[in-house]
């Protein structure tokens, strides 16, 4: 008697994706951390643009606007660096810093918009120089990223 062997080709089992292995909670945590980091970098860019305007474009001699540019840089630096600290125990601080980053970006955008159309504290800006375009882009990215970060946090808690 001959024995018939069943012929089969062995194929290696595909490796599951990291996202499948880690589950939705870890994926959400990664997305949250990525959004927080993106928002932090955008806030730091907003501050850097204001520092550049303060020092290089001589906004430091404009009476009220100059000190506001310096304060914007200082606030953006504190907020951005605080958001980059990756400690799980700082969740409440990250929440407050994200709200602060959104507030800083929205306020910067609003003050620029006002100063383009009428004098603000005795100063009126004009045109869209490269610095203004970079600041507007960074402010938009900061708001979108930090709002999305807060939304992922809220969804994870629910």
Where are the regions that the model predicts?
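Membrane-interface extramembranous regions
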Residues: 2-158
């Amino acid at each position: 008697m001959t024995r018939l062997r069943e012929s089969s080709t062995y194929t290696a089992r595909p490796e599951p994706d990291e996202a499948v292995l880690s589950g939705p909670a870890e994926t959400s945590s990664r997305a949250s951390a990525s959004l927080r980091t993106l928002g932090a970098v955008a806030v730091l860019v907003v501050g850097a643009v204001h520092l550049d305007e303060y020092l290089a474009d001589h906004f430091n001699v404009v009476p009220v606007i100059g000190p506001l540019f310096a304060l914007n840089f200082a606030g953006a630096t504190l907020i951005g660096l605080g958001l980059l600290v990756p400690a799980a125990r700082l969740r409440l601080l990250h929440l407050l810093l994200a709200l602060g980053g959104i507030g800083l970006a929205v306020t910067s955008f609003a003050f620029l918009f006002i100063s383009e159309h009428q004098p603000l504290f005795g100063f009126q800006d004009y045109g869209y120089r490269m610095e203004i375009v970079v600041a507007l882009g960074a402010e938009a990215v900061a708001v979108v990223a930090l709002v999305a970060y807060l939304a992922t946090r809220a969804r994870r808690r629910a």
